[in-house]
Design a protein with these regions (language model features):
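Short, small/polar residue-rich loop motifs at catalytic or cofactor-binding pockets
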Residues: 3-5, 62-63
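Short histidine-centered loop motifs in beta-beta connectors
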Residues: 10, 50-73
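Zn2+-dependent peptidoglycan hydrolase active-site motif and core
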Residues: 14-58
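Acidic, glycine-rich catalytic/binding loops that coordinate metals and/or anionic ligands
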Residues: 36, 63, 68, 93-139
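Histidine-centered catalytic micro-motifs
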Residues: 57, 87-97
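Short glycine/proline-centered loop/turn elements that form peptide/ligand docking sites
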Residues: 63-65, 81-88
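Short hydrophobic beta/alpha edge segments that flank linear recognition/processing sites
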Residues: 71-83
């Protein structure tokens, strides 16, 4: 059981869908495939040479189409375990081009979260931190 499994994945910002893949199977736990590393995924063009990848979505859950404009907070799919993934999770990656791994990586800013218990109004979580959205704390 994984908390994130089949949870809705929301667009983190307004943008245009420039790539989407759906129909790849979710992997059995602990098994990974290297030939489609992102699995089912969506790439949003945020403008200003900023592209965000939302990867490892659940098979059959991608809810947006290529060229579609999406609003911040709009559901784009559901959390899964497709692609090169050993367990359900969402992979978020920002870079300067729409092709995975082809561009320069960009820092991703988040708002209203706690990192290791400390409230952050805006910042960049780092490896090893436990991160909780403020909205989840209030529930």
């Amino acid at each position: 059981d994984y908390y994130c499994w089949d949870e809705p994945i929301l667009a983190p910002a307004e943008g245009t869908v420039v790539a989407r893949v759906d129909g790849l199977p979710d992997q059995p736990l602990g098994e990974m495939v290297a030939d489609r590393p992102a699995g089912n995924h969506v790439v949003l063009d945020l403008g200003n040479e900023e592209f965000i990848f939302l990867a490892h979505l659940r098979n059959g859950s991608v809810a947006v189409s290529g060229g579609q404009h999406v609003d911040e907070g709009q559901e784009i799919g559901r959390c899964g375990n497709s692609g090169n993934s050993s367990e359900p999770h969402l992979h978020v990656h920002m870079q300067t081009t729409p092709e995975l791994g082809a561009g320069k990586g960009l820092p991703a800013q988040f708002q209203n979260y706690r990192a290791n218990g400390a409230l952050k109004l805006r910042g960049e979580p780092v490896r090893g931190q436990t991160v909780i959205a403020v909205e989840d704390i209030l529930k």
